[in-house]
Amino acid sequence: MNDVTLDDGTIIELKVAHIDDYQNGGYEYLYSWLSKVDQFLAKRYRVADLVKNKEQWLSRLNTNEITLLGLRQGKIIGSATLIMNDPQSRAAHVASFGVAVHPAFQRKGIGKLLISGLEQIALDRGIEKIEVNCYDGNAAAALYRSLNYASEGRRLRKGRLDNGTYVDELLFYKFINPF
């Protein structure tokens, strides 16, 4: 897609993911930092599951999902995936997304850039509504609100953290192509 210079001078390359981005240690690097932030994600990223998770991740590259990457010096430091419904579905006008940014690069605007890029891709594909969720306490909730995502609800005790405590899931939406 393009190179973007952040406020601190860091240059980030934004691009649509390709299988080559995950070769030569690319996926392993991504996985290593996802495992550090997975308490905020719906999926756990444990070292023992790396091979299985890599196979699943790569198999999704040719489905109704489009992933945008943020790269710094060729390393993946941000990832956002747009998940589109089956085109034959009555919910084909709705998509959802997930986003994660390397801990060292959070709060620098990378998440906002990735989400804005996904919104443009969704618009280009005729998507009207985008949904996203996160666990209560995740700083991403403030990011979604700052991008005009509205609250759609809350699922009580939807997630269970590694320490055994439960956390609610917050649901957000945004109409990007209003009817």
State where each predicted segment sits.
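Conserved N-terminal entry element of GNAT/NAT acetyltransferase domains
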Residues: 1-24, 178-179
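Short hydrophobic/aromatic beta-strand or adjacent loop that forms the aromatic wall/cage
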Residues: 65, 167-171
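Conserved GNAT acetyl-CoA-binding A-motif
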Residues: 115, 122-133
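Conserved acetyl-CoA-binding loop-helix of GNAT-fold acetyltransferases
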Residues: 101, 107-122, 141-146
